[in-house]
Regions:
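Walker A (P-loop) phosphate-binding loop of P-loop NTPases
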Residues: 94, 134, 145
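Glycine-rich phosphate-binding P-loop
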Residues: 127-142
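Switch II of P-loop NTPase G domains
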Residues: 2-29, 35-51, 68-74, 158-164, ...
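Conserved beta-strand/loop subsegment of P-loop NTPase cores
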Residues: 29-35, 53-65, 84-88
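Canonical P-loop GTPase G-domain recognition
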Residues: 65-130
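Switch I (effector-binding) loop of TRAFAC-class P-loop GTPase G-domains
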Residues: 13-16, 119-122, 145-172
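Active-site phosphate-binding and catalytic loops of NTP-dependent enzymes
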Residues: 11, 18, 39-42, 109-117, ...
């Protein structure tokens, strides 16, 4: 499948991104990938599939209210056929995010059970949050934290340092790990299209 985006990844960006993701993958239990539902494939990091491999992952197709409903459904089916869990949402309003933590709990059920048997019930599940600028990653983290943990703005890459965010759902603790500094070269027209509504 294809969409209409035009994002260029240069060797320097690729190297930096790969290093950041590889470092964080070692300390997390799963990956949360934020994309723009209007251009889901173009708003993905192209090296993520190779890096994540067998690590549990969920894609949040953000800004779903601005996307074509039929196209979103087809993209959701496309990713699910590849074994990736998908939720549609709007991170700024919170629409659809009530399903996120229950979905993560289901996705990591085996890990939760193993920890329970080891007496590690209170150990937080660690989730790495990834997404290129302007897909709504900061809005997602702020919404989950119920407070403003990260800066939200139109300038690409406003989140530059690793940020840790604690959240909880039905007694289960979650630690969101946001790796900053991932800045591809985004076409100006596409960037304007992707900016927060």
């Amino acid at each position: 499948m294809n969409d209409v985006g035009n994002i260029q990844w240069f060797p320097g960006h690729m190297t930096k991104t790969k290093r950041l993701i590889e470092a964080d993958l070692k300390m997390v239990d799963a990956v949360v990938e934020i994309t723009d539902a209007r251009i889901p494939e173009s708003s993905r990091n192209p090296i993520l599939d190779d890096l994540v491999k067998d690590k549990p992952r969920i894609i949040l197709m953000n800004k779903c209210d601005y996307a074509d409903e039929n196209a979103t459904r087809l993209w959701k089916q496309y990713y699910e056929k590849r074994g990736i869990r998908v939720l549609t949402c709007d991170c700024r309003s919170g629409k659809g995010l009530n399903r996120f933590l229950p979905e993560v709990k289901t996705m990591l059920a085996d890990l939760i059970e193993r920890r329970k048997k080891r007496g590690m019930i209170g150990k937080a599940l660690r989730l790495m949050v990834v997404g290129i600028p302007n897909v709504g990653k900061s809005s997602f983290i702020n919404r989950m934290a119920k407070t403003k943990k990260t800066k939200v703005g139109d300038k690409p890459g406003v989140t530059r340092d690793r940020i840790f965010c604690d959240c909880e759902w039905c007694g289960h603790k979650f630690l969101l790990v946001d790796t900053g500094g991932i800045e591809p070269n985004i076409d100006d027209g596409l960037l304007a299209h992707m900016r927060e509504q």
